[in-house]
UniProtKB/Swiss-Prot annotation:
The gene is tatA. It is a single-pass membrane protein. Pfam families: TatA_B_E. The keyword Cell membrane applies. This is Sec-independent protein translocase protein TatA. GO terms for cellular component: TAT protein transport complex. One of its GO terms (biological process) is protein transport by the Tat complex. It is found in: Cell inner membrane. Gene3D superfamilies: 1.20.5.3310. Belongs to the TatA/E family. It comes from Methylibium petroleiphilum (strain ATCC BAA-1232 / LMG 22953 / PM1). The Tat system comprises two distinct complexes: a TatABC complex, containing multiple copies of TatA, TatB and TatC subunits, and a separate TatA complex, containing only TatA subunits. Substrates initially bind to the TatABC complex, which probably triggers association of the separate TatA complex to form the active translocon. The lineage of its organism: Bacteria, Pseudomonadati, Pseudomonadota, Betaproteobacteria, Burkholderiales.
Length: 76
């Protein structure tokens, strides 16, 4: 009772194809594959060691030449 035979799974597959159609199942499969690929790429990119944080800060400061550095003063 706990396991299903191959015939049960084939009948379920046939019903799913009849309900959703092959085109929609193809779209779902390609979307799922794209999501898995994106996840793997994200994990692979995240595993590389980041550069020195001090170098990142100086690179950001040089890129923001129009930014004005101000300091807020409290009223007495």
């Amino acid at each position: 009772m706990g396991s299903f035979s191959i015939w049960h799974w084939l009948i379920v597959l046939l019903i799913v194809v009849l309900v959703f159609g092959t085109k929609k199942l193809k779209n779902i499969g390609s979307d799922l594959g794209g999501a898995v690929k994106g996840f793997k790429d994200g994990v692979r990119d995240g595993s590389t060691a980041p550069a020195d944080p001090a170098q990142q800060v100086t690179a950001n400061k040089s890129a923001d030449a129009n930014t004005v550095d101000v300091e807020a003063k409290q009223k007495s």
